[in-house]
Swiss-Prot record:
This is Sperm mitochondrial-associated cysteine-rich protein. Sequence repeats lie at residues 6-13, 14-21, 30-37, 38-45, 46-53, 54-61, 62-68. Involved in sperm motility. Its absence is associated with genetic background dependent male infertility. Infertility may be due to reduced sperm motility in the female reproductive tract and inability to penetrate the oocyte zona pellucida. It comes from Homo sapiens (Human). The keyword Membrane applies. It is found in: Cytoplasm; Mitochondrion membrane. GO terms for biological process: flagellated sperm motility; penetration of zona pellucida.
Length: 116
C-alpha cells in the first residue's frame, strides 16, 4: 500500500504510517511514529518509542525489537543487575553472622571476671 520508492518499510498495524527514506522503520503499535534518521529503530510493544542515537536499538532479550519497549544505553549492564539482586539477600545473612560473632567474644569476658 505504501510507495516503497518514497518511503521505507511500513508497519503492519492499524493506523500505520510510512516513514520517509531518511528515517528509520516505524514502530508497530498504538501511536506508530517514525524515528528520525539520527535515532535507532523503535521497539514494538505498547508505548513504542524511538531510541536516541546514544542508545542501542532495543533491550534484550530479543533485539532489535524486544518484548518490553525500552531503549538501552550503549553501556550494557544486564549481567550486573542480577548480581546486585543476589547481594541484597546475602546482606541480612552477613548481619546475622555479625551478631553471632559479637556474642562469642562477649561470653569469654563474662567468664574472665568470675575467674578473678
Amino acid at each position: 500500500m505504501c510507495d516503497q520508492t518514497k518511503h521505507s518499510k511500513c508497519c503492519p498495524a492499524k493506523g500505520n504510517q510510512c516513514c520517509p527514506p531518511q528515517q528509520n522503520q516505524c514502530c508497530q503499535s498504538k501511536g506508530n511514529q517514525c524515528c528520525p534518521p539520527k535515532q535507532n529503530q523503535c521497539c514494538q510493544p505498547k508505548g513504542s518509542q524511538c531510541c536516541p542515537p546514544k542508545h542501542n536499538h532495543c533491550c534484550q532479550p530479543k533485539p532489535p525489537c524486544c518484548i518490553q519497549a525500552r531503549c538501552c544505553g550503549l553501556e550494557t549492564k544486564p549481567e550486573v543487575s542480577p548480581l546486585n539482586m543476589e547481594s541484597e539477600p546475602n546482606s541480612p545473612q552477613t548481619q546475622d553472622k555479625g551478631c553471632q560473632t559479637q556474642q562469642q567474644p562477649h561470653s569469654p569476658q563474662n567468664e574472665s571476671r568470675p575467674s578473678k
